[in-house]
UniProtKB/Swiss-Prot annotation:
Domain of life of the source: Archaea
Keyword Metal-binding: yes
Keyword field: 2Fe-2S, Electron transport, Iron, Iron-sulfur, Metal-binding, Oxidoreductase, Selenocysteine, Transport
Iron-sulfur among keywords: yes
Family: Belongs to the MvhD/VhuD family.
Protein name as it appears in the record: F420-non-reducing hydrogenase vhu iron-sulfur subunit D
Assigned EC number: 1.12.99.-
MF annotations from Gene Ontology: 2 iron, 2 sulfur cluster binding; metal ion binding; oxidoreductase activity
Cofactor: [2Fe-2S] cluster
Pfam families: FlpD
Source species: Methanopyrus kandleri (strain AV19 / DSM 6324 / JCM 9639 / NBRC 100938)
Enzyme category, top tier: oxidoreductase
Assembly notes: The F420-non-reducing hydrogenase vhu is composed of four subunits; VhuA, VhuD, VhuG and VhuU.
Length: 132
């Protein structure tokens, strides 16, 4: 039995989700393994959300937020960046590959960046496999 990888993407409503939506309306090709979770701001994404996604079956998790200096909620994306780094450190301490988690910054007009993020995290998922 072959399992299909699952990539969870936490996308802020303003930019990350806008880029995902633009990719969809533009009929961009990217792996169907991505599951998008729309959040008001990436500043609302905590370490617990990332770890829960992994615990519930995600092979990789990424956050798609506003470009640095352009967060609609001032510095939510920077707060999330610190949390992603903390999550990676915690995973490493637990013996889990920190490469399973990433953050990307993009504007709502950058569908290509969203597609590239999905493809990169899908490839990482295939390389790393599921969590045991």
């Amino acid at each position: 039995m072959s399992e299909e990888s699952v990539v969870v993407a936490f996308c802020c409503y303003e930019u990350g989700y806008g880029a995902a939506d633009l990719a969809g309306t533009g009929r961009a090709q990217y792996p169907s393994s991505v599951r998008i979770v729309r959040v008001p701001c990436t500043g609302r994404v905590g370490i617990e959300h990332i770890l829960t996604a992994l615990a519930k079956g995600a092979w990789t998790v990424f956050v798609a937020g506003u470009k640095k200096g352009e967060c609609s909620y001032e510095d939510g994306n920077l707060k999330c960046e610190r949390r992603v780094q903390a999550a990676k450190k915690l995973l490493e301490e637990l013996g889990i590959e920190p490469e399973r988690v990433e953050i990307y910054f993009m504007s709502s007009a950058e569908a290509d960046k969203f597609v590239a993020a999905v493809k990169e995290m899908h490839e990482r998922a295939k390389e790393l496999g599921p969590l045991a």
